[in-house]
Amino acid sequence: MAKAQSYFGTSRGLGLHASRRGLLRAGLAIGSLALGRRAALGQPGGMHAHMPEPGVVQMPLVPVTDQPLVEPEIRRSINGVLSTSLRCAYAYRDIGGTRLYLRSYEGGLAPTLRMKPGETLKIRLTNDLPPNRDIVPGNPSYPHQLNNTNLHFHGAHCSPSGIADNVMRSMVPGNSYDIEIALPEDHTSGTYWYHPHHHGSADVQVASGMVGAIIVEGDFADVPEIARARDRVMLLTQIVFDAFYMVEDFGTLFPETATRFLAINGQRRPVIDMRPGEVQRWRLVGSQYQNNMLLELDQHRLNLIACDGIQLGAMQETTQLLIAPGQRARSEEHTSELQSQ
């Protein structure tokens, strides 16, 4: 997967107006894909072979937009170790006004993991997805056994073997295993992410929302304005589902007849409130499974400051950001000291 960018936005030319309470609302405007309301039923032989139960409650597609941004839970390292657990299981999620039944980490929006260079990440990964009902095809490169899983620390400079960041490991439903990833002392600080990387099931699981951010702290520590800024994590995803409001077949991910839209942290076009003079650091994670995303702030400008932890020599001002799957972006947003109306 490709890697991403970071942005630093200022209010020079943002065209924002302060409210009576002195709050500035910065709306994240991501164009949605209106590709039809009926979802694809998938391919013969694979349709809902991994469903845990029938009778999922269906709800009409009623877009819900312009709600305050919801951010993931934060889990931090202690004394050089970030020790946590992640559970893979189906869960109901209300996304963009539609109730979906999807594979997930921790039953919804996956936690953000924060650690420092030289520290160790320890995860007990539990697979509580239902048993697979299909067999391995003659060509194992075809999608199969969609409830097998593993975990990948995307972008980390670490060991790919043993119980570290080993994408060749496979965990069948009903099992658990330990992951231990040690970062070197000189590891690049910045925004990373984690996701399944099991060949045959990764796309379906990522499309279901099994993605989370990892922050390796210390980036821009020598720039006080950035170091003091409030961090906000934004996971960019493509929401797609079939007629059962699920993702149960590889074919659901690609046909133009599938219902799909874009989301940030499981929300359609969320809104961020900023006080006059406030600075925020936005960490954007391109965790979509397929398409590039064109991101912009409504009437705002953005300034690129780093690419996947690699700091640029100077800010690069822009109005739009194209993020490919796997890319990450840090974004600093400024608001000026405007007078209340």
Question: What label would you give each PLM region?
Answer:
Residues 333-341:
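Residue-level detector of conserved catalytic or cofactor/ligand-binding positions
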